Amino acid sequence: DVCSSDLAGDFAKTVLMPGDPLRAKYIAETYLENPRQVNAVRNMFGYTGTYKGKEISVMGGGMGMPSIGIYSYELFNFYDVDQVIRIGSAGAFQDNIKLMDVVIGMGACTDSNYAYQYGLPGTFAPIADYELLNRAVETAKRQGTNVVVGNVLSSDVFYNAMSNVNDLWR
């Protein structure tokens, strides 16, 4: 596995996962109290510390579904993690979404065949846990953050060969 088996128990039940491992390091050093590094395999840095008294981990997930798929699978299945929350940057199809807006995914769509590997027919579109979604939205609103809730799209392709693909997904 990509994480060291010596680290079982070192991850919190909740793991925040930006794509960039250096962003994970920045988050740990800036926001966590007493952060300790729990992973450096393949330079996919992971840290555990506390935030406002709650134990939390942050670890890079890499670029694309195959990368985060491997890391999240191992966190859930080998390290007893309960929640993985993807954080970080993304593109947008809607013109009303601005830089620094917080987008909270209510449902997740894909043009990938990733779900097929798990015996799921078609393109399974998981939806968010309502309680977690509602807490995130209410917290963002209380803090005066511009928040947009809706479906998100993940793709295996970063630079698509179809020039009109963005228009088709709108």
Feature-to-residue mapping (PLM):
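Short, small-residue-biased leader/transition segments that mark boundaries at the very start
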Residues: 2-4
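N-terminal low-complexity or amphipathic/hydrophobic leaders
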Residues: 6-40, 50-52
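Glycine-rich phosphate- or other oxyanion-binding loops that anchor nucleotides, phosphorylated ligands
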Residues: 40-170
